């Protein structure tokens, strides 16, 4: 009030995100991880974690959800993942048990220690995950191409179906691998890419790729 205002200094557009007390977005959980290092508001993750993961702060028991992550620095075992609350993130790699899945940069998708090969990624590529918590179906994408000829909007071509009560985004980095997640906060991934400004069907989020029809950002307004 009284025309007393702060003047922004040394701020870029990507330093301002829609996350707020009235609509809180998922980030990576700083206390639910095994040896990972976080930056950029707990959206960037690195660290040489051979057996272990980091989960997100917001999960879902029902509904359809979408998130994405940019592979800033390539390492083949670095993975975008999903896990439930029962997974032991301190001793398991993503997809080692039936309690998590992981899509690795080198092209392998893991579930219950079984691997299926899809497209590999390189630095600058973008991982995508869409999941339906009601049916347990999971889709994975690379640069807006859904693997296994998947079509999340139509419910076809999922890479895995699981029976979980609770779904949480997760991450695993190995060696020099670096991932920058976007749960709808910043489609430029901290200025590493050109922002694309795609919202979900409720008008929430700032995604690089448009979420599939019927899939939404993990935020408190959508829950």
Regions found by a protein language model. Give the residues of each.
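PRY/SPRY (B30.2) beta-sandwich protein-interaction domains
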Residues: 1-223
């Amino acid at each position: 009030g009284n025309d007393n205002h702060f003047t922004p200094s040394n701020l870029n557009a990507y330093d301002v995100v829609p996350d707020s007390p009235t609509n809180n977005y998922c980030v990576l959980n700083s206390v639910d991880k095994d040896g990972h290092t976080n930056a950029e508001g707990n959206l960037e993750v690195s660290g040489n974690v051979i057996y272990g993961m980091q989960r997100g702060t917001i999960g879902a028991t029902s509904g359809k959800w979408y998130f994405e992550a940019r592979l800033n620095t390539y390492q083949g075992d670095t993975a975008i993942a999903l896990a439930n609350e029962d997974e032991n993130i301190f001793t398991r790699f993503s997809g080692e048990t039936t309690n998590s899945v992981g899509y690795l940069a080198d092209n392998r998708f893991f579930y219950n220690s079984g691997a299926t090969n899809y497209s590999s990624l390189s630095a600058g590529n973008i991982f995508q995950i869409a999941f339906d918590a009601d049916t347990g179906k999971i889709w994975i994408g690379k640069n807006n191409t859904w693997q296994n000829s998947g079509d999340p909007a139509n419910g076809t071509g999922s890479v895995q179906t699981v029976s979980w009560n609770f779904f949480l985004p997760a991450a695993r980095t190995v060696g020099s691998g670096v991932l920058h997640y976007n749960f709808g906060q910043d489609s430029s991934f901290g200025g590493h890419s050109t922002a694309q400004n795609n919202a979900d069907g409720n008008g929430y989020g700032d995604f690089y790729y448009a979420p599939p029809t019927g899939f939404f950002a993990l935020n408190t307004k959508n829950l």
